[in-house]
Every structure is written in structure tokens, then in C-alpha cells.
């Protein structure tokens, strides 16, 4: 599904993203709090970074941070996210259904401070405007509808936020213009 997600979620400088997490400090060690199948969990930073690679075999990860004037939101966002540990992953990508997909967890964590905005979701090929076959099969297997046009959020939308600054590149995500 990562390729299908990346195709429909363009982000920072045209980069295609399929996942997002929140870096947290746990026992003096940087880790990543994320919603990934099967649940919301804390992952070792090394494992998170080395999950996906660019064509040069560098981790396909960029680091974004809230701009300084929004950093007062971080403590509450981390607490909120930790309160969701072990809640099941949201396979259908719907907001407000008591499960979480990666971007939804980040959105909800910062909701009280209105850091990120929901946008209409799409599962359509950007050129043909046809629903991608992989999404038809995926939602058919889940025995539910494709939430085309429903409000949602994705890693690309978050990376485009004017409240974020991109501060580091481990590698170059597909689609990214230098």
C-alpha cells in the first residue's frame, strides 16, 4: 500500500510520503511514537528510519519540526499520543472511529492548538482520476467503502503545513524536487 499512498499524497517539494511519526524521548533515548499496523506503539528510532530506502539506499525519511511559535503544543501532543498506545491501527483511514492511522494520530495530538487541517482524501490516480486498483482491492477485502472525498489527513498534507519547518533529510523521498 505504501506506493499507492505515496502516489496520492504529494508533500514537501513534491515528495511522496506514506508514513509519519512523532519523535519522543524515552529513558534518554529518542524513539518514534507512531500508528502502524497493528496498533499505536513506540518504535526504536533506528527501526523507524531504516524501514524504507531511496534509490541510493539511504533512508527515505525527512525530519520536520514545529516552528518555534508552536512548540508549546508539543508536551500535550506527546501526552495525548502516549495515551493512545496500544489502540488498534485504523485500516480504513477514517477520522473519529476510535482507531488511528499515522497522520490521524498526529492530527489529533495537535488538535487543541489547531496545528494541522483536514482535507478531502483521495484514492484516485492523479493523472487518470480513476480509483487505483490497489485501493479497490484493499477496501473490498475490508468489506467497506472507499472514503473518497471524506475529510482526512496524510503525511504529505502535514509536510506542507506552514507551521512545520523541514530540518533534515536522511535520503530523498520519491517525487522530491531538489
Q: Can you name each region flagged by the protein language model?
A:
Residues 1-178:
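Cysteine-nucleophile amide-bond enzymes
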Amino acid at each position: 500500500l505504501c506506493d499507492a499512498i505515496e502516489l496520492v499524497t504529494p508533500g514537501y517539494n513534491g515528495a511522496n510520503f506514506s508514513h509519519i511519526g512523532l519523535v519522543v524521548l524515552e529513558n534518554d533515548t529518542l524513539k518514534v511514537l507512531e500508528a502502524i499496523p497493528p496498533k499505536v506503539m513506540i518504535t526504536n528510532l533506528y527501526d523507524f528510519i531504516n524501514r524504507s530506502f531511496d534509490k541510493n539506499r539511504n533512508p527515505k525519511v525527512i525530519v520536520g519540526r514545529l516552528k518555534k511559535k508552536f512548540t508549546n503544543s508539543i508536551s500535550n501532543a506527546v501526552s495525548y499520543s502516549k495515551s493512545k498506545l496500544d489502540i488498534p491501527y485504523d485500516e480504513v483511514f477514517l477520522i473519529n472511529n476510535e482507531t488511528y492511522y499515522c497522520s490521524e494520530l498526529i492530527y489529533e495530538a495537535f488538535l487543541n492548538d489547531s496545528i494541522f487541517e483536514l482535507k478531502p482524501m483521495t484514492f484516485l490516480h492523479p493523472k487518470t482520476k480513476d480509483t487505483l486498483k490497489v485501493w479497490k482491492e484493499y477496501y473490498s477485502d475490508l468489506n467497506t467503502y472507499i472514503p473518497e472525498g471524506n475529510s482526512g489527513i496524510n503525511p504529505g498534507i502535514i509536510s506542507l503545513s506552514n507551521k512545520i519547518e523541514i530540518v533534515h533529510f536522511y535520503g530523498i523521498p520519491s517525487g522530491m524536487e531538489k
